[in-house]
Amino acid sequence: MKIILIAAMSVNGRIAQSTNQSSLEWTSKEDTAFFVEKTKETGVIIMGQKTFETIGKPLKGRRLIVLTQDKSLESQNIALDENGTRLEFVNETPMDLIHRLESEGVESVVIGGGSFVYSSFLRERLVTDIYVTIEPVMFGSGVPIAESFGDIKLRFVGSKTLGEQSVLLHYEVV
């Protein structure tokens, strides 16, 4: 299975100034367009509850799986329309979730944040590809893209300019 980590970050490696800040507040429209395109291509997005709360709604035409420790949310798994819009709240380890999705025939997923979720999937060595958009901003403090996961070797696949100011980098995990 392809497990694709997608993140936008500041030049100094921050994905937000605080845990309740949406990346939509400071990233380029081209980065948003890339995220929409890639997540529609895979059809399945995994993110943490805090990241979901910054978005506040399901993503049209995609299956959104929200990792949460709030057991009361787990019963709120909803198929919202015939176009594949689906919202699920789960309390599973990354490995268990990936095994379940593979058994369902899912071929690729996007890991959409935040830092804790990125770190969890990296720690378990599940990520196969990383797309990072570098935005032209530096935050004096904030949320790191990931931490506490050990060294990971990457192979540079390519880069692309998004708009006039942002750069999208693609790496494969080796």
Where are the regions a protein language model picked out?
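Enzymes that bind and transform nitrogen-containing heteroaromatic metabolites
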Residues: 1-174
